[in-house]
Amino acid sequence: MNKETLLKKFGKNVKIERIKKDLTQEQLAEIMNVSQNYIASIECGKANMSLGKILELAEYMDVDINLLLAFEK
């Protein structure tokens, strides 16, 4: 699996969990102190998050980090 595919799968997982939590991109961006465009870029697989930010995201969304990092083929 290449980097582009992983980023897209990660972004899809973020979007799924965000929607389950009934959060808009704007709300999540505000919670994480980032722009809505950054959240949109993550969900589209165009932004690469650091491990620290991924941990933060999991905490803010109250989800197991493994759900965000589940990369099925």
Q: Which functions belong to the PLM regions below?
A:
Residues 4-5, 67-73:
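Short, charged recognition helix plus adjacent turn
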Residues 1-9:
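A detector for short, charged/polar N-terminal pre-domain segments
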Residues 52-67:
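DNA major-groove recognition helix of helix-turn-helix/homeodomain DNA-binding modules
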Residues 12-31, 56:
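Short basic helix-loop element that most often maps to the first helix and adjoining turn
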Residues 8, 19-20, 47-48:
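Short amphipathic helical patch at the helix-1/turn junction of helix-turn-helix
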Residues 33-47:
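Recognition helix of helix-turn-helix/homeodomain-like DNA-binding domains
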Residues 14, 28-29, 39-42, 68:
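Conserved hydrophobic/aromatic packing and binding residues within compact polymer-binding modules
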